Amino acid sequence: MQPLRSLCGRALVALIFACGVAGVQSEERGFPPAGATPPALRTGEIVAPPTKTFWPRGSNASLPRSSSPPQMPKGGRMAGPPARTLTPPPCEGPIEIKDTFKYINTVVSCLVFVLGIIGNSTLLRIIYKNKCMRNGPNILIASLALGDLLHIIIDIPINVYKLLAEDWPFGVEMCKLVPFIQKASVGITVLSLCALSIDRYRAVASWSRIKGIGVPKWTAVEIVLIWVVSVVLAVPEALGFDMITTDYKGNRLRICLLHPTQKTAFMQFYKTAKDWWLFSFYFCLPLAITAFFYTLMTCEMLRKKSGMQIALNDHLKQRREVAKTVFCLVLVFALCWLPLHLSRILKLTLYDQNDSNRCELLSFLLVLDYIGINMASLNSCINPIALYLVSKRFKNCFKSCLCCWCQSFEEKQSLEEKQSCLKFKANDHGYDNFRSSNKYSSS
């Protein structure tokens, strides 16, 4: 009996040790937790996609916790009774991403890369070449497309490589640059959508503001502010992300992640509150601003509908089309980023490391998170497609530009530009007559 008990004891110790090693390895190559993730965000979850994960509740650590014994105080005795910690039961198997999701993520990323470069570069070319497309809303859309293009060119290829190679060979500089560009791109998207919603309300509320050709000074100031604020808000990503080195199965792996031990109190607070900050500013803010100003715009249009003349019908139709286009862009943004933010919030609110059913929840959240990553990446290429489907003017310009890319854009669009410019002038003349008649009638 004694040899049998000794053998069972050794087997039990070996099993516990194996589970501990598996947990440490899983944590070392784990899924970026609350503080190490954004929505790209356009964010750290795409910088270091996981193959295995271990999520401690309320922790932002991605490194194994220290297993050293507690320090002995002076005198050789502990200050109190030894603390007893309840270790949660280990999962039956590692929570990991299967190869199927890797292939799906790679295919989606390649599609986003190709469609995003073609769509956003074509959109920028249309607005740059076509003089009648150079107005306030379209310049904001061009700013949004430029931010998406930077994210697509720099971030997506590196993210695909990181997922397949499970190593970070690009150095510390790229480890800081990739999440910085990704977060700046998301900030440009969010603030541009907010500016577009406000611009549409101003266009409807002030009927004397006729849409013309060229970039208004206020729009130029808005674009500069959007880029400056987006870059400033992305600076904590560059400061917080770092590259660590760890040994795994005899191999030396380099991992890029939001470091679990930050140097300053501000960065420690940022790491702790990052998911809630991303959800509130980068997701809820554009939706709230769009809902508020579009409600005001609808009330304004219903109130002033009786005072419109037939001469302004074409002008109002153009404004309604632009308003519909902006609303479509905001809706696409919400649909693309909802799964990723939902997985983060569910992880923060529902996960409990002492729950016996936490392994099933981890598997669900990991799948939901990867779906969210792919959906968020899709937002970088879907805006030109949405403009093509919603706006007739953009649809005609896309057809002409894509079908005749090697030909001179001015030669193909000269007649359409002249007709559009004459149409604007006619609308302006009709509106001036309408204002003059109202002025004399009121007098």
UniProtKB/Swiss-Prot annotation:
It is found in: Cell membrane. The keyword Glycoprotein applies. GO terms for biological process: aldosterone metabolic process; calcium ion transmembrane transport; calcium-mediated signaling; canonical Wnt signaling pathway; chordate pharynx development; developmental pigmentation; endothelin receptor signaling pathway; enteric nervous system development. Residues 59-69 have a biased composition (Polar residues). Keywords: Cell membrane, Disulfide bond, G-protein coupled receptor, Glycoprotein, Lipoprotein, Membrane, Palmitate, Phosphoprotein, Receptor, Signal, Transducer, Transmembrane, Transmembrane helix. Residues 128-138, 199-219, 298-325, 391-443 are cytoplasmic. Residues 1-26 form the signal peptide. Residues 27-102, 165-176, 245-272, 352-363 are extracellular. The chain crosses the membrane at residues 103-127, 139-164, 177-198, 220-244, 273-297, 326-351, 364-390. Glycans are attached at residues 60, 354. Its main location: membrane. GO terms for cellular component: plasma membrane. It is a multi-pass membrane protein. One of its GO terms (molecular function) is endothelin receptor activity. Belongs to the G-protein coupled receptor 1 family. Endothelin receptor subfamily. EDNRB sub-subfamily. PANTHER family: ENDOTHELIN RECEPTOR TYPE B, G_PROTEIN_RECEP_F1_2 DOMAIN-CONTAINING PROTEIN. Non-specific receptor for endothelin 1, 2, and 3. Mediates its action by association with G proteins that activate a phosphatidylinositol-calcium second messenger system. This is Endothelin receptor type B. It comes from Sus scrofa.
